[in-house]
Amino acid sequence: MERVTPRTLSGFMELLPAKQVQMERMMEILRDSYSLYGFTPLDTPVIESAQVLLAKGGGETEKQIYRFMKGDTDLALRFDLTVPLAKYVAANYGQLTFPFKRYQIGKVYRGERSQRGRFREFYQADIDVIGDGKLDIINEAEIPAIIYRTFTHLGLSKFVIRVNNRKVLNGFFELLGLSESAGDIMRTIDKLEKIGGEKVKQLLMDECGVEEEKADEIIRFISCPGTSADKLSFLETYRGRCETFDLGLDELNTVAGYLPAFGVKEENFAIDLTIARGLDYYTGTVYETTLTDYPEIGSVCSGGRYDNLAEYYTDKKLPGVGISIGLTRLFYVLGEQGLLSDELVTAPADVLVIPMTEDLTFPIAASTTLREAGVRTQIYTEKKKVKQKFAYADKMGIPFAVIIGDDEAAQNMVSVKDLTSGQQELMSPAAAAAKIKAEMDVRNSVTVIREK
């Protein structure tokens, strides 16, 4: 028989057990955060009709998707979680209660060129609030609070949630007589951090047809310095000249005004007029979140307000606001920067029960007592030397061992050994469960991310 060399395709990630535990812990924190704000979990098929996924049209998306025929059916793998959400809300409109708040953590697929930190299969973690006909601005103010809570519970403190409003930008372009080019201009200024102001100015002139004087004015406007309060004051100087601009400024003031009540610290929030988000469907507040010490990573959480999520599937107007975290990429870059905590307990069990008796009745009963107390317990029954059993626990990173020999079994007692300190005590199974549970509660309080 010819054996096949096991390999993983380029652009696809497989993790060893300890790293997988870290990833799962991150997902748990995201789920907990999203649930605290009243979001319900949603799962949609990985494979959809290509007609449904590409209802908006082809372009770059069609070039990147994984698409195939099964019989006469044209199928594709989902490339994000937004289009499946639009389909889901349109298909189940009559059975949903609005505003509909959902979160979804799932794999998506894009046939991009594989490169460092970029994947073809990756997890996204999305939240969206969908309204029926209208959606109150307070939902746009709540989004930064959710980002703040999520990132702080992951263990991050040095991050900034950067916020802007597309109506402010559209209104400003209208004042310059550039409304027809607004979409192209936004996609261009969205590149500011990557290529710098001079190159953006050149692109505005060369590709968007903007006159040099107006290109300079755009760069000056979006590069306004100062605090969030300074920028709001700067924007007030334009009030009264354009209705769209004024509406966007009102929305920006509302979002910024509610953040202290939502518990968002001032140092973790900034109004940033350079944030445009290149996607055309954003119509109001837009968000990007960056790590203060690692600006080269770029945005790790982004999104915004849109006015008609499902226009390609229904005539119902379904406005919404949402954000997305590229979880696989975030996990990868955190690992690259050494920010994933090595103190996080990644072992599959809290305790390894090591029977040293022929009769396993008491060791099994003791294991049951431990599990009923919430202690993750593995019983080692392989016929190996004691030294090999402890070596197994050490290699797996299991912090405690419960040793049960004939003497312990005769007394209905167990020996609990802390495999870090080497200390060993004789006690009842119930006492052992309480001791290990209390110790593990402390050890499990370590965050996934540890900032330097």
Question: Which functions belong to the PLM regions below?
Answer:
Residues 161-172:
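Glycine-rich, mobile lid/loop segments that gate access to catalytic sites or pores
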Residues 33-42, 71-73, 94-97:
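Short, solvent-exposed loop/edge-beta patches enriched in aromatic
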Residues 58-59, 176-178:
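Short secondary-structure boundary/capping segments
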Residues 42, 46-75:
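Polyanion/phosphate-binding surface patch
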Residues 63-72, 178-200, 291-293:
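Acidic, His- and aromatic-enriched active-site or binding-groove loops in soluble protein domains
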Residues 1-19, 69, 179-182:
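Auxiliary tRNA-acceptor-end handling modules of aminoacyl-tRNA synthetases
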Residues 19-37, 48-49, 82-94, 102-157, ...:
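Positively charged, Gly/Ser-enriched RNA/tRNA-binding surfaces
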